[in-house]
Amino acid sequence: MMVWNWIDRTPRRVLALISLACVALLACGLYLQHVVGLVPCPMCIVQRYALIGLALLTGLASARSAKGWWLTLSALAALTAGFGATVAARQSWLQWYPPQSVSCGRDFYGMIESFPLSRAIPMILRGSGDCAAVDWSLLGGSIANWSFLCFALLGLLLLALLARGVRGARQRAPAPV
């Protein structure tokens, strides 16, 4: 109940915290890439783009004072979180099967440069042999598993924020004549 009251009173702060969480997750990914030496697969890169989109949308929503704007941007952010969770779930699914059952795909940048977007996106989501590899884990969960958990939690928080915002807007709206 206390969480709901906090969300009701400070929706812009919640959006700013979600944006900061996305930036922190991106920083973790860059640390794993540049310091630890892990090379991101195509699906990891798509998840990074989803995090960037989520950070931008929630950052903009926290900066806008008009309720209609933050509700619209929050709804787009919730859809972006759902997309990121879907890609992370797909990658987790690929990891749960033996590597020999996953066919190797093309390089991410090669797909983008060689194919139109309508053909590149299905190829990226299909994954590659690299997407099935588990090179690092924390508490038994792969990066894809943790990514799914983060996207799902951020998406649920955004949905709760939207539900409270829409409910509050309905209560304050004048009654129809």
UniProtKB/Swiss-Prot annotation:
Keyword terms of this UniProt record: Cell inner membrane, Cell membrane, Chaperone, Disulfide bond, Electron transport, Membrane, Oxidoreductase, Redox-active center, Transmembrane, Transmembrane helix, Transport
Name of the coding gene: dsbB
TM annotation in the entry: 15-31, 50-64, 71-89, 146-164
Top-level taxon of the source organism: Bacteria
Cited function: Required for disulfide bond formation in some periplasmic proteins. Acts by oxidizing the DsbA protein.
Identification of the protein by name: Disulfide bond formation protein B
Family statement drawn from the similarity comment of this UniProt entry: Belongs to the DsbB family.
Segments in the Cytoplasmic topological domain: 1-14, 65-70, 165-177
Lipid bilayer topology: Multi-pass membrane protein
Matching InterPro entries: DiS_bond_form_DsbB/BdbC, Disulphide_bond_form_DsbB, DsbB, DsbB-like_sf
